[in-house]
Amino acid sequence: MVKIEDLTVKYPDGTTAVDNITMNINDGEHLALIGANGAGKSSLILSMVGVLPSDGSVEIDGVKLGKSTLTDIRRLAGVVFQNPDDQLFLPTIYDDIAFGPRNMGLDEESVRYRVEDRLRLLGIEHLRDRTALKLSGGEKRMAAMATVLAMKPSVMILDEPTAFLDPKARRNLINVLKSLPHTMLIATHDLTFAAEVCRRAVVLRKGSVFADGPTDELLFDDELMDAAGIESINVYIGNIFKK
């Protein structure tokens, strides 16, 4: 379970990026984090794993975020960044996925088992000996997810996971995420994706929680979404078919 209480993030110039956010994410829940650019989504994500300094409290599976618990927090909560190139930097995908387990001190046999298990789970065994430089956006996304899953986190945090994906790769990602048992926090502008993968959504506005409720209610609420600076699914679909 993830517990966030009175979380505030301020940048050196005095800008408040996250303003006194309190929310919980239940075990196994897939929560969509929705908001316009600058609403605080990325700042919230980074503060949850100690990348950005913050005031308030973050607790993941009973471990409270602090200087002495950073390693534990980052093992419990794995972040899949918006740009998969940030997580794929070694000669082969095998090495990228093995990087975390090796740093945990696992022996090579255990590392090999974890890597091959994650490759199999995501259906990317054929990428084992490939370099990220030769992969498509969808292949990179799956490989980046495998690097996180190899650490066996209980919580997955994904920042704009459908970025760089073509429709087929996007559908594959949806199917994979729906099949995983992990607790998930998914920051996204892709509202139809959020509606399919997440039953609950939190809408941010100016760094604060503007709305929290069932995804299929919030994302279709034209007035609420407009007030948050986002185009609702209804408006989005209407514009597609507008003559």
Predicted regions and their residues:
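Conserved ABC transporter NBD signature motif
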Residues: 56-65, 73
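ABC ATPase nucleotide-binding domains
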Residues: 216, 220-243
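Conserved ABC ATPase "signature" C-loop
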Residues: 206-207
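Conserved ABC ATPase signature
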Residues: 131-135, 139
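H-loop/switch region of ABC-family ATPase nucleotide-binding domains
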Residues: 188-189
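Conserved ABC ATPase "signature" region
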Residues: 109-127
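A short, surface-exposed alpha-helical micro-motif characterized by mixed small hydrophobic
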Residues: 194-196
